[in-house]
A protein has these predicted regions:
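One-carbon transfer enzymes
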Residues: 1-147
Length: 147
């Protein structure tokens, strides 16, 4: 089955992918990442949260994980960066912030999703993106969704 995972480039999503991907080894998996949630400027408390959830992982931790032997996992390493996870999925891991625009939607269509798992994805899917996968979209989100 072709499974497309839509997720955010943050700590919780990286952890979720580390748990999901091994269980999906029998499937064709493509992962698209959003760079952030929402498009409005962040209030100061949310900027601090962004540092903990995104900047710390992507700017400090992941480069250290990826620096050894071309990013290959170290012996005994249990959690992997987005870049290391990309080596474990056939469809790759890439950024897709504009899934509802023509070019972004075309990239999404190319993943030929039978099922979409949306885990903390930072973009609200419009009807064409929602109706594309024949088995639907399963949305896993850690908080209330906007109206």
């Amino acid at each position: 089955m072709n499974i497309t995972i839509l997720t955010n480039r943050d700590l919780a999503s990286c952890f979720a992918l580390n748990r999901l991907i091994p269980g999906l080894a029998e499937h064709q998996v493509t992962v698209f990442l959003s760079s952030r949630v929402g498009s409005k400027p962040l209030a100061l408390p949310l900027q601090h949260l962004k540092f903990v959830e995104q900047d710390l992982l992507n700017g400090l931790i992941a480069p250290l994980l990826d620096s050894g032997a071309l990013g290959r996992a170290r012996v005994g390493q249990a959690l992997f960066s987005f870049e290391q996870l990309a080596e474990r999925v056939i469809g790759g891991v890439s950024t897709l912030n504009a899934i509802n625009d023509a070019a972004g939607y075309e990239r999404y269509v190319e993943s030929k999703p039978d099922l979409v798992l949306s885990v903390r994805y930072g973009v609200i899917l419009r009807d064409p993106a929602m109706s594309l996968p024949k088995h639907g979209v399963l949305n896993l989100h850690s908080g209330l969704l906007p109206d």
